[in-house]
């Protein structure tokens, strides 16, 4: 089973913490992947346009090894990384050990160990919030968000080639339209963003594609990439918690 398929299947089952087999099993390779992603900065620019975290409290849900925590910590007042996999909790804690404004805790999207209405921004990047099945996490994010706070979900766009084509090869039954409708019905706005992944060596590129896809699809992807870089599409989904009472 491909790594993407494992995550989607667990999401549909409503699992409390979704396995992220790529970073759980190969954290060193996933660190290479994180460094290769978004080399144009398009994702961070889009997030900054949609969400203001300067001087505010942020929670990064499914923070993994904490790769994105330093970026938030540059301007946020406080940053909390939440991660269900204990080895990654330790890695993220070590990464941020010298920054007193950042805390890393064990927890899940369904059980965020923070008080009600305690953060202005909840961020999740390619973690848990994949579509139907993530409703408990949406409720929990609303609980920890203060009125007017924003949940920002960054996920891959399966419609965007070539990466989306490779994803669909491993997920032939995946219904992108149903996923889009799910988030639209839940009140999210969607911004589609193209950025690039760029690697230092072909060996790095091949290793990363090897942990993201089944063996056959990874081999096809490696053969189709010329050089060290390729475009990748993302969806940046945002939903703001209402500031007042909702009358129905």
Which sequence ranges carry the predicted segments?
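A short glycine-rich, Lys/Arg-flanked "PGG" loop and its adjoining helix->strand segment in the class I
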Residues: 135-147
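Conserved acidic residues
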Residues: 56, 77, 120
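Conserved class I S-adenosyl-L-methionine
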Residues: 1-56, 67-71, 150-180, 212
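Class I SAM-dependent methyltransferase SAM/SAH-binding core
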Residues: 59, 64-111
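Conserved Class I S-adenosyl-L-methionine
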Residues: 65, 184, 189-248
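A short acidic, Gly/Pro-enriched loop at the edge of an enzyme's catalytic core
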Residues: 110-121
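A short SAM/SAH-binding and catalytic strip from SAM-dependent methyltransferases
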Residues: 120-134
């Amino acid at each position: 089973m491909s790594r993407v398929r494992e995550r989607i299947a667990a999401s549909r089952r409503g699992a409390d913490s979704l396995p992220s087999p790529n970073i759980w099993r190969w954290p060193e390779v996933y660190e290479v992947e994180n460094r290769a992603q978004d080399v144009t900065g398009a994702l961070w620019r889009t997030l900054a346009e949609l969400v203001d975290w300067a001087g505010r409290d942020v929670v990064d849900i499914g923070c993994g090894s904490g790769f994105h925590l330093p970026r938030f910590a540059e301007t946020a007042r406080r940053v909390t990384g939440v991660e269900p996999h204990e080895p990654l909790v330790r890695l993220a804690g070590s990464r941020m050990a010298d920054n007193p404004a950042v805390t890393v805790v064990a927890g899940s999207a369904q059980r965020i160990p923070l008080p009600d209405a305690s953060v202005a921004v909840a961020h999740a990047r390619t973690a848990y919030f994949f579509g139907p099945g993530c409703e408990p996490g949406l409720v929990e994010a609303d609980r920890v968000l203060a009125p007017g706070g924003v949940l920002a979900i960054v996920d891959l766009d399966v419609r965007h080639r070539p990466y989306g084509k490779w994803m669909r090869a491993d997920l032939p039954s995946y219904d992108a339209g149903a996923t889009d409708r799910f988030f639209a019905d839940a009140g999210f706005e969607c911004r589609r963003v193209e950025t690039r992944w760029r690697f230092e060596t072909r060996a790095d590129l091949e290793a990363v594609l090897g942990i993201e896809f089944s063996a056959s699809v990874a081999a096809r992807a490696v053969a189709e990439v010329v050089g060290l870089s390729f475009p990748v599409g993302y969806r940046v989904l945002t939903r703001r918690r209402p500031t007042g009472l909702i009358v129905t």
